A protein has these predicted regions:
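Radical SAM/AdoMet-radical enzyme domain recognition
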Residues: 1-102
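Auxiliary Fe-S-binding modules of radical SAM enzymes
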Residues: 94, 98, 109-143
């Protein structure tokens, strides 16, 4: 329906990925071009704590694979929280590098006071970059 308004329109969505394996083909056939999946950990316990749900990393990753197979462009958004999921940076980079999926690390920020945000929990972009570069060497920009 949206695609009919403009055949060149870039249609995207952001999701936690929990239903993506079920709907990726249908979404692609409906005209979706790309999807951003929010995943803040590979560790299932951390995912449960962050999302307050029982979604597993396997379910999310299976959804990402289904989206790839459906021809959708994919990006990953990951929020890193100091002393909580910092240890997930390298496993996330390794996994999505192997899958050829771009990961964007996003600084933890106040979203209206709904998550008991604390400035001391912020891991800044340069800190994340340093952790990654210590493990893999100098990073280069991706367009």
């Amino acid at each position: 329906m949206i695609r009919e308004c403009d055949p060149n329109l870039d249609i995207a969505m952001t999701t936690n990925g929990s239903l993506l394996s079920k709907y990726a083909d249908e979404l692609a056939k409906s005209g979706l071009n790309r999807v951003t999946v929010s995943i803040d950990a590979i560790d299932d316990q951390l995912i449960r704590e962050i999302s307050n749900s029982n979604v597993s990393s396997k379910k999310i990753i299976d959804g990402i694979i289904a989206a790839q197979n459906a021809g959708l462009k994919i990006k990953i958004n990951t929020v890193i929280i100091k002393h909580f999921n910092e240890d997930q940076i390298i496993p996330l980079v390794e996994l999505f590098y192997r899958m050829r999926v771009v990961v964007r690390f996003i600084e933890y920020m106040d979203v209206g006071g709904t998550q008991n945000w604390n400035a001391n929990q912020v891991v800044f972009g340069d800190e994340i970059r340093e952790i990654i570069e210590q493990a893999f060497g100098r990073l280069t920009p991706v367009n």
